[in-house]
Structures are given as structure tokens and as C-alpha cells.
């Protein structure tokens, strides 16, 4: 009952306890959208007085949570579009529209959590392999390279392919799945090493690249001299694409090889293929 001032004060006191006594880094606030905004405004301001660099995440989506004082919100709309694209029910235009909209309506510097799986999705809606099939890695590349902070959920680094029980102990079997372990290691290192992919106001600009094919989604992230070009085939068939971007010399992140890119030259991207190039 958020009309009860004593209850509000007690909740804020409990949150402050964990900051002052345990020196925690921050909070993930569950189901934040079912709590009044004015409570968050008061509570988060109090926490920031104690620890100015505290990190605050809302399990919710919407610009109002950033206005309330949260640093990061869930990228649910992007996640749902990934699932729809995987089923052939949506095109990359939808993802591009969401990103452009976020850049317009959210406060500058907002963080968005991008993901292909999390504890709710895995248990209730299925693993990324159930929902995204052979596109699981492709959408993993997307989640790690579009604007936002990338979530790696329990077991994804070893290709966990079953739903974990939500309310009972259900341990992950840590298989030696080096294919996926190396895949996510490469993505995490890519994000760490390239300022263009950093989060919030620290990261670079996003720009969609015309490919002359609705199933091939390409974009750049650029900050100063640092540029990352991502090319994704969001379908189960190979397709040709013509990139409307500048010619240049790049390094292929996944092969480690140098690669020249010529503007207007046709390239073939295999089914659910992904190419990540950096300068």
C-alpha cells in the first residue's frame, strides 16, 4: 500500500541499509512498473545521496523510469521484435524504428538492456533455440552491437538448451561447448575494446545501412575513428546484398582476417549469417 507513508519510509530505509552496510553496487528493481513513480523518485534520490555512482535498473520499459532516476531499463520491445523476426512475422525495419524512437523519446545517455534470453523468457517462453532457432547466434550479435547493454543469461555461454525450473533448484550442466563459449567471448571482447559499442552516452552513433534487401539488416556504430559495421541475414535463406556505405579496410571480428569493403559491391550472406567488421 503505497499510500502508507510509514511503509514507504521503511522500504527506503531497507534499501539504504544495503548501500551503507554492504556497499552494494546497485539495485535491479523487480516489476518496477507496478510501483508509483513518485516512490521511485523519492527512493532513488535518497540512494544517490549516499552513493552518487550507484547503478539503478528497472525491470520495466519506458522513458518515465529514466526520468524517475533509473539508469537502465529492459529492452523488451527489441526482444519481442527479435522473436517475431525469427518467426518470419516481422522485418528489420521494426528493429530500426525502435532504436530510432528510443534515441528520440528517452533521456540522453539512457541505458537499455538487450537480451536474447533471461530468467523469465527461458522458463516461461523457452530457450533462445526454441524461440529463435538457427538465428540464436545472429540475434546474439544484434543484442551485443545495437545501442544498449548486453545481457548474457545463465548457461547461454555453453548453449543451455532447456528451460530452467523457475521456483526450484535446477543446476546448469556446464558442458564444454567451446563453439558458443568462444562466440560470446568474442562478442564481449568486441564490446569492451571498441568505444563505438560502449553504453549510453559513452558509446557511438547508430546508423542503418541500406542493403537493397529487406532480410539483410546492416548498421554501423561510430565514435571518432572507431567504427563497427554489422551485417545480419535475418532469414533461413542465403541472400545477396549491396551495401550503401563507404569503402574501407576492416578486420573481420570472427575470422580475424583483414577484409576490404567496396561500396556498391554485391556480397552474399548465408542463412542466418552474421559479419562483424571493425576499423
Positions of predicted regions on the chain:
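Active-site-proximal helices and loops of the catalytic beta/alpha 8
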Residues: 14, 20, 30-112, 142, ...
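Asparagine-centered strand-capping/turn motif at beta-strand->loop junctions
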Residues: 231-235
Amino acid at each position: 500500500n503505497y499510500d502508507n507513508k510509514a511503509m514507504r519510509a521503511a522500504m527506503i530505509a531497507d534499501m539504504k541499509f544495503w548501500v551503507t552496510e554492504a556497499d552494494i553496487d546497485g539495485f535491479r528493481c523487480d516489476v518496477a512498473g507496478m510501483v508509483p513513480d513518485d516512490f521511485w523518485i523519492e527512493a532513488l534520490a535518497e540512494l544517490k545521496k549516499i552513493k552518487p555512482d550507484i547503478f539503478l535498473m528497472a525491470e520495466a520499459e519506458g522513458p518515465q523510469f529514466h526520468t524517475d532516476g533509473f539508469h537502465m531499463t529492459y529492452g523488451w520491445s527489441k526482444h519481442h521484435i527479435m522473436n517475431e523476426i525469427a518467426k518470419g512475422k516481422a522485418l528489420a525495419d521494426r528493429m530500426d524504428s525502435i532504436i530510432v524512437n528510443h534515441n528520440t523519446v528517452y533521456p540522453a545517455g539512457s541505458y537499455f538492456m538487450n537480451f536474447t534470453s533471461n530468467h523469465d523468457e527461458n522458463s516461461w517462453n523457452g530457450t533462445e533455440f526454441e524461440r529463435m532457432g538457427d538465428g540464436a547466434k545472429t540475434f546474439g550479435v544484434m543484442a551485443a552491437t545495437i545501442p544498449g547493454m548486453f545481457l548474457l543469461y545463465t548457461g547461454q555461454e555453453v548453449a543451455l538448451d532447456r528451460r530452467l525450473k523457475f521456483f526450484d533448484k535446477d543446476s546448469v550442466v556446464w558442458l564444454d561447448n567451446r563453439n558458443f563459449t568462444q562466440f560470446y567471448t568474442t562478442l564481449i571482447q568486441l564490446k569492451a575494446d571498441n568505444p563505438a559499442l560502449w553504453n549510453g552516452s559513452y558509446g557511438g552513433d547508430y546508423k542503418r545501412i541500406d542493403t537493397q534487401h529487406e532480410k539483410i539488416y546492416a548498421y554501423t556504430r561510430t565514435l571518432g575513428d572507431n567504427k563497427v559495421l554489422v551485417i545480419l541475414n535475418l532469414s533461413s535463406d542465403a541472400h545477396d546484398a549491396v551495401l550503401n556505405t563507404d569503402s574501407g579496410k576492416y578486420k573481420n571480428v570472427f575470422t580475424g582476417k583483414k577484409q576490404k569493403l567496396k561500396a556498391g559491391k554485391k556480397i552474399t550472406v548465408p542463412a542466418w549469417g552474421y559479419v562483424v567488421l571493425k576499423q
